[in-house]
Design a protein with these regions (language model features):
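Extended non-catalytic accessory segments flanking core domains
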Residues: 33-298, 302, 306-318, 349-351, ...
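Divalent cation-coordinating acidic motifs and surrounding scaffolds
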Residues: 105, 184-185, 189-192, 214, ...
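Secondary-structure junction/capping motif
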Residues: 6, 41-44, 481, 491-492
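Short amphipathic alpha-helical segments, especially helix-boundary/capping motifs
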Residues: 21-22, 41, 143-145, 430-435
Length: 575
């Protein structure tokens, strides 16, 4: 959890004492009856929590009584503990648990009376500073409340803040972006979460929010030496499942978060795919966003030569795994052909070493634009032959102009025209007017992407057997994709990939397809298959090439987390 002790007032930190240990489970019930506390409480915990998001007693000093349910007092933890009333009130709107920011030594099942000031800390109701913690006996362990997501009647989690919970049913790993940095993982009830604008059923924003839960590690350490859920070197992937999640519900940095009292175990439900699913055909075409392949250090890609070598090794492994005849690339450094040549040279060296028989060349971009990154084609000179020269567009709607190149099987056959693209991103920097976020789920610059799609549709209409591919920064049910489909182009991933597997990117825990392969009518009849190779979006980012913060033992020169986008692959029957 991102909770910094340094952000605490000095007086509060001065009041903290020695730390206690991490709870590894809920203690068994004890038969001994607790003695009466000498100092009575003057408020119930439910009164402190109130019926809303914030405490009605904020700023006041109160004295509450309860039983310790979780102890996270170490300096690398939350520097406090959770207390819960063993006799809850009858109001379902109020919580009967609360966080106590104090390192006064306590243990789970201690019956305590705590005196402290009620504050809202990043949205969490807690007692801080604490002037007294009186331990007055040992109580029966508080049994966790059983809950299931989504909650009934659209109820929120506020009523469970500070309460010991057990989540019933299976939960699916849906986001690991901050697993390596903060020890956080997002899970969801009922399966993977999808972008509402990607055309999946039951994926509205409200439904997604009701099904998701952030699981924290009860720690304030950033970039911990030991990353959760990496036992025996096996790293959790999105789609893996857990059950019986148990812990105390906290809140911070805009999210409810479960602080586990029992370490979750994730079962492998989404095995790593060593190679793409077969797509058939005599020519295979791939689309791959390289996530800023730069030979220039310290720009968008690698910061050091060592990182650049690590990135290159992973990119080569991914390209060799795709085993494609033509590959459309995105986010290649726009520094002439320097970065592109370095990638192709490394790919050919690896191919020669293994005797794969492939020798790749690249297509020069006639007008790559002025952006720091560009699109590119690499192709196997033994299996396909370029037909005519490369073309592009000087339409100022493009920040990164497309690249158009026709290819024919080297042994003879039908030609097709590949059009590789990288549309304007969804980031909102500088967006105004129609490019501003319209609140329709398509984020910023959708109007620009619609214009880009229309321009590409015109290029495709004039091309022989067009295949539009690349990172279109648009999910499958958004306006730009509709423009292309209305122009007669057909999504081959929608056609061949099962709905639950149709995603290439994960953002804020939501899976969706930003990368696309769309074929013209005649070429679509020659498509033998399509797949999305999930080697990147399901993997945590601490597996990538970066050396800062990423534990060295997890790096492998393989395809997994070679980028943040999954590559796409289609098969064509052209002979």
């Amino acid at each position: 959890m991102r909770r910094s002790a340094a952000a605490r007032p000095a007086a509060v930190l001065a009041a903290a004492a020695v730390t206690a240990g991490l709870v590894t489970g809920v203690a068994p019930a004890a038969a001994a009856a607790p003695a009466a506390c000498a100092v009575p409480a003057d408020h119930e915990i439910a009164d402190v929590q109130g019926t809303g998001d914030a405490s009605p007693l904020a700023g006041r000093t109160v004295r509450v009584e309860g039983v310790v349910t979780a102890d996270f007092q170490r300096s690398d933890q939350l520097r406090g503990f959770f207390v819960q009333d063993p006799t809850p009130d009858d109001d379902p709107r109020t919580s009967d648990g609360i966080f106590v920011y104090s390192t006064r030594e306590v243990n789970v099942r201690d019956r305590v009376v705590v005196t402290g000031k009620v504050v809202e800390y990043h949205g969490l109701t807690e007692l801080s500073p604490v002037s007294a913690v009186d331990v007055c006996g040992t109580a029966r362990a508080i049994a966790p409340d059983n809950v299931r997501l989504p909650l009934e009647d659209g109820a929120g989690l506020e009523r469970f803040e500070g309460v010991l919970l057990r989540f019933r049913g299976q939960m699916v790993a849906s986001e690991t972006y901050d697993l390596g940095r903060y020890g956080e993982i997002t899970v969801a009830a009922g399966g993977r979460l999808y972008q509402p604008t990607d055309g999946h059923d039951d994926s509205s924003q409200a439904e997604n929010e009701a099904r998701r839960l952030l699981v924290d590690d009860a720690s304030n350490v950033q970039n911990p030496d030991t990353i959760p859920y990496t036992a025996d070197g096996r790293v959790v992937r999105l789609g893996d499942v857990t059950a019986g999640l148990t812990g105390v519900l906290s809140y911070g940095f805009g999210s409810y978060r479960l602080q586990p009292t029992r370490s979750p175990h994730f079962a492998r439900a989404n095995p790593r795919p060593d190679k793409p699913r077969p797509v058939g055909g005599d020519v295979r075409v791939a689309s791959f966003n390289t996530l800023n392949w730069f030979t220039t250090l310290g720009r968008r890609g690698a910061d050091t030569a060592a990182e650049r070598d690590r990135q290159l090794a992973k990119l080569v492994a991914a390209l060799r795994g795709l085993d494609a005849d033509v590959v459309g690339l995105m986010e290649v450094e726009n520094n002439g052909d320097t970065a592109l040549k370095a990638l192709v040279d490394a790919l050919n060296a690896a191919s020669a070493e293994t005797g794969s028989g492939r020798t790749y060349a690249w297509t020069a971009h006639p007008y790559p634009g002025t952006d720091e990154i560009k699109v590119a084609f690499v192709y196997d000179t033994a299996t396909v032959t370029p037909v005519g020269g490369p073309r592009s567009s000087r339409d100022d709607v493009f920040d990164r102009p497309p690249l158009v190149q026709a290819f024919r099987p080297a042994a003879g056959g039908t030609a097709f025209t590949a059009i590789v693209n990288h549309f304007k991103s969804k980031g909102c920097g500088g967006a105004s007017g129609p490019d501003a976020d319209q609140g329709d789920g398509q984020s910023c610059y959708n109007a620009r992407r619609v214009k880009q799609a229309a321009a590409i549709a015109e290029l495709a209409a004039a091309a022989e057997n067009p295949l539009v591919l690349g990172d279109l920064n648009s999910y499958a049910a958004e306006d730009p994709i509709e423009v292309l489909e209305d122009a007669g182009l057909t999504s081959q991933t929608k056609r061949f990939v099962d709905d639950e597997d149709r995603y290439s990117y994960v953002y804020m825990g939501l899976s969706g397809e930003l990368d696309h392969m769309l074929a013209g009518p005649a070429l679509a009849r020659r498509v033998t298959g399509a797949t999305i190779w999930h080697v990147n979006s399901d993997e945590p980012r601490f597996l990538d090439y970066n050396t800062e913060y990423n534990p060295a033992e997890f790096y492998r020169p393989d395809a997994f987390r070679s980028s943040d986008h999954d590559p796409l692959l289609v098969g064509l029957d052209l002979r």
